[in-house]
């Protein structure tokens, strides 16, 4: 019978072989906090950047963001574009849904004058354009909105009642086989937005599935499930959504982390709201009753007033964000411990304190 030491050696050899064959990050311990040294683009949400383990979405990889309608998928990707443009990166948006609003994009901080936009006629054209942009090596971030709208040419040219079983899945599988190597070589981030469908006849387990077959699930290094969990109200008026994102797959750090943040209408992700929540959670912002204090100074009664103070003092907000980013990305064990402690205290999640 093999000893513990022999088993550990055999396991280490097996893990080494798997990583050699399938790439680093293809297998890891669930509690492993070690992240790969990969260049990342911020999502615009500090808590999501921390949950991803590397400070954002990984360059040179495929990412899938999926969720129900109006859950914040496009808002999140536009936020990624805004952050990438701040770093001088070139971005492209392949709008297969023909629904991109330039005014809304500009409100989220996107430089619409520098953003490359394509509205293709069919799925083949969209993926060929994506392939050409990746091969150029000059584009850093490409968003495809959405997989469900990548309609094969044969379906568009056919009759309404014609059956086109598996056409889109085959199209995606072929395109991803072609794209994946080029994406790695050009160090380009390609984000596919996807929609949710219900599987018919599922009695047990989750009936939800994403469109476009299974290929994207395999090729994606990161998969994010985004959901709206509630409304944010100011009096009787609804001013935004409470949003929850779960990292359902992550090949560059530990998966299955979950974060909550707010998306405000016309503004996008509420950065000041996140700073207050994370600041309190990691003891950089003090909370006594309804009062919030930062650096020993009271900054507001109630979360809305504390957020307003940070908006009026951008230098203090930037200093707090820098402190949090440096501390949490450098100490992922602390993040994991804080998440476990929070889950033990309450399973209700974050609530809007307005």
From Swiss-Prot:
Family matches, as InterPro entries: AAA+_ATPase, DNA_recomb/repair_RecA, DNA_recomb/repair_RecA_CS, P-loop_NTPase, RecA-like_C, RecA-like_N, RecA_ATP-bd, RecA_C_sf
Source organism per UniProt: Pasteurella multocida (strain Pm70)
This protein's name: Protein RecA
PANTHER family the record matches: MITOCHONDRIAL DNA REPAIR PROTEIN RECA HOMOLOG-RELATED, RECA
Function per UniProt: Can catalyze the hydrolysis of ATP in the presence of single-stranded DNA, the ATP-dependent uptake of single-stranded DNA by duplex DNA, and the ATP-dependent hybridization of homologous single-stranded DNAs. It interacts with LexA causing its activation and leading to its autocatalytic cleavage.
Key word S-adenosyl-L-methionine present: no
GO terms of biological process kind: DNA recombination; DNA repair; SOS response
Keywords: ATP-binding, Cytoplasm, DNA damage, DNA recombination, DNA repair, DNA-binding, Nucleotide-binding, SOS response
């Amino acid at each position: 019978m093999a000893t513990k030491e022999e088993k550990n050696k055999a396991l280490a050899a097996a893990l080494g072989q798997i990583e050699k064959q399938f790439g680093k990050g293809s297998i890891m311990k669930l509690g492993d906090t070690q992240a790969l040294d990969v260049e990342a683009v911020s999502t615009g949400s500090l808590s999501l950047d921390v949950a991803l383990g590397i400070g954002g979405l990984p360059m040179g990889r495929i990412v899938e963001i999926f969720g129900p309608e109006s859950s914040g998928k496009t808002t999140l990707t536009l936020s990624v574009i805004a952050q990438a443009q701040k770093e001088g990166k070139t971005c492209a948006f392949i709008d297969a849904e023909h629904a991109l609003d330039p005014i809304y994009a500009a409100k989220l901080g996107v430089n619409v004058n520098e953003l490359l936009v394509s509205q293709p006629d069919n799925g083949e054209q969209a993926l060929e354009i994506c392939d050409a942009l990746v091969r150029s090596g000059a584009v850093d971030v490409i968003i495809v909105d959405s997989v469900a709208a990548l309609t094969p040419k044969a379906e568009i040219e056919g009759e309404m009642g014609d059956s086109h079983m598996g056409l889109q899945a085959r199209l995606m599988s072929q395109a991803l086989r072609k794209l994946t190597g080029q994406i790695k070589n050009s160090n380009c981030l390609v984000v596919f937005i996807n929609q949710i469908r219900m599987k018919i006849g599922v009695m047990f387990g989750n009936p939800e599935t994403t469109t476009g077959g299974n290929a994207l699930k395999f090729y994606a290094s990161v998969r994010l499930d985004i959901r709206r969990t509630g409304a944010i109200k100011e009096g009787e008026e609804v001013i935004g959504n409470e949003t929850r994102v779960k990292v359902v797959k992550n090949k560059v750090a530990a998966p299955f982390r979950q974060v909550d943040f707010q998306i405000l209408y016309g503004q996008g992700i509420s950065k000041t709201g996140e700073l207050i929540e994370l600041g309190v959670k990691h003891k950089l912002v003090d909370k006594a009753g309804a009062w919030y204090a930062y650096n020993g100074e009271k900054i507001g009664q109630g979360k809305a007033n504390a957020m307003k103070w940070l908006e009026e003092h951008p230098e203090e907000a930037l200093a707090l964000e820098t402190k949090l980013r440096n501390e949490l990305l450098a100490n992922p064990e602390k993040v994991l411990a804080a998440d476990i402690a929070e889950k033990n205290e309450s399973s209700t999640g974050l609530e809007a304190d307005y």
